[in-house]
């Protein structure tokens, strides 16, 4: 036991106490309320006794300036559950949307009351779902479709549960592996058909903000809880690191394991892997280009290769583990805003660097993507690069910011260097419905013309786009003269 005089306080800036902030996804695990400010609706990011932070995943129609006092309204299923006035105290632009922090002016958050009103609003919405004005915005065809999806999924769950009960009466144990393998092929086939239908239906609501938000709320209430039985769906929806598509989700795709406590959970996870398969296939394309660059440019000096938004950098790890890595010298630079991702990449790649005896070096930059856009940003710290790639970042950006980033990366290329940009492809079986509506994972889907436009006016030797094996990711290649 410590004596009273041995008890310690905080140091530095932490001596200024602030009320505890709660992650909105944890405080409201089923469906966090939206925050209405002026004419725009925002995602609640975190909340404390005296303030909130929100995220705008699409460009806001309203301009918010630091110091401005505005009215804020929390809405659950279209019903108001909290109202107050707040001062804008911070704004931040990230690849995943704009963040705004507000300090309440003449009120505070009564958490007991807020949670109670949130539940009441959800119950009221459930009780009047078909007649409520907001939920009338959800297409009738989509309601029936979600029922069909649940019917398919729960038929597998019921079948597995029944067989598990039957085997409990016999001395033989339930064959979990056999049950998984018996269901997997047929279930994935049915899922892909439903996925295609879902895409067709939700494209009709994408042009209307109100209809899109209402349809997403319906999905998150009806379908998302079922899908969260799968590990990759749960992490994608909950976003425990505060943003979508974190490096652990990438790892789940690369590892392609049967995650889950039972066969049904493993199968739902498998459906999520089917959607995210393009993360792995785009990685294989990049790994091939790394090998080409090292072979062509890494003989007399190290080929310089930079990855923006590197995440776990599995393409580099697997390249270094292959015989191709002995074909030349290389110097890799990993850039990511998440130190944990860089730490894991370093831990996994460093043993291979030792084995290669100095042929390959690696640097890591923990800087924000916004810094990259600045003239005197992080790219000034590295020499001109023979290859730069960013395959999981620009689909979070508006077209204007994406164009600026492409130009900034192109400037950082050495003569003859190659820039590779990946973006989710606009195609019939795109990831639109499963990611945007089930997992609340907002991306910009683009076609050949939209991506090629980013290269216009750069003075490139050549530029073109390709898609990887699944056709769900489009890659823009720009070669500098």
What is the predicted role of each segment?
Residues 1-49, 57, 119-136:
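N-terminal helix initiation/capping motif
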Residues 28-37, 64-81:
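Short conserved beta-strand and strand-loop elements enriched in small hydrophobics
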Residues 52-56, 92-106:
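Short, solvent-exposed secondary-structure boundary/capping segments
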Residues 67, 127, 150, 154-201, ...:
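Class I (Rossmann-like) S-adenosyl-L-methionine-dependent methyltransferase catalytic domain
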Residues 86, 110-263, 289, 293:
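N-terminal accessory segments
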Residues 300-311:
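Conserved class I S-adenosyl-L-methionine
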Residues 375-388:
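A short acidic, Gly/Pro-enriched loop at the edge of an enzyme's catalytic core
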Residues 385-400:
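A short SAM/SAH-binding and catalytic strip from SAM-dependent methyltransferases
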